[in-house]
Amino acid sequence: MGGTFDPIHHGHLVAASEVQAWFDLDEVLFVPTGDPWQKSDRDVSPAEHRYLMTVIATAANPRFTVSRVDIDRSGPTYTIDTLRDLRAQLPDAELYFITGVDALAEIFTWRDAEELFTLARFVGCTRPGYLMDDAALATIPTDRVTIVEIPALAISSTDCRRRSQRGEPVWYLVPDGVVQYLAKYDLYPRVIPPDTTKDTSEDMQ
């Protein structure tokens, strides 16, 4: 599973667990991106922090491991380089690349897109409220792609960062160890005023 993981959250972990069970995978390898070219328009936390948060978040699951293949490679991170490196390291393995269906819809904009499907099968995880464009879906080779419906956890890394920057809790959105890591290193300093638009007129029942 490739991703920026800035930060990693329970949505990532549930998706990985569901796909592992669906395909009876021996392991799920989490691959934090080094320098994500798609996100050059915003600040991204240092790769080492994102790697360590991923290690913390996945430590309890014996089928989860974390790779440094992308963060130890210099230059922008491209999926084609990730898969070539993993294929060289694991020549006998059948590789499945797990990503969100929104990212999958853009796959033909990725570097050396045609070669990607020769290196791995792709698993597109559905997200709450997201419908993949039929035209985009029609361009993807169905024998190399599987769409998997994931239990609806409406969590995103963007929301976790913004909550932290507003001084709001991220408990139960990210693993406990990641909450403590964020606090220790103050990765997302408070810069946004608290959200005062919430309806607090009724007590929770």
Curated annotation (Swiss-Prot):
Q: Which reaction does it catalyse?
A: nicotinate beta-D-ribonucleotide + ATP + H(+) = deamido-NAD(+) + diphosphate
Which UniProt key words apply to this protein? Answer: ATP-binding, NAD, Nucleotide-binding, Nucleotidyltransferase, Pyridine nucleotide biosynthesis, Transferase
Q: What is its EC number?
A: 2.7.7.18
List the Gene Ontology MF annotations in alphabetical order: ATP binding; nicotinate-nucleotide adenylyltransferase activity
Q: In which pathway does it act?
A: Cofactor biosynthesis; NAD(+) biosynthesis; deamido-NAD(+) from nicotinate D-ribonucleotide: step 1/1
| Leader sequence segment | none
Q: Which CDD domains match?
A: NMNAT (cd02165)
User: A biological process (GO) annotation for this entry?
Assistant: NAD biosynthetic process
What does the function comment of this entry state? Answer: Catalyzes the reversible adenylation of nicotinate mononucleotide (NaMN) to nicotinic acid adenine dinucleotide (NaAD).
Q: Which family does it belong to?
A: Belongs to the NadD family.
Protein name, as recorded: Probable nicotinate-nucleotide adenylyltransferase
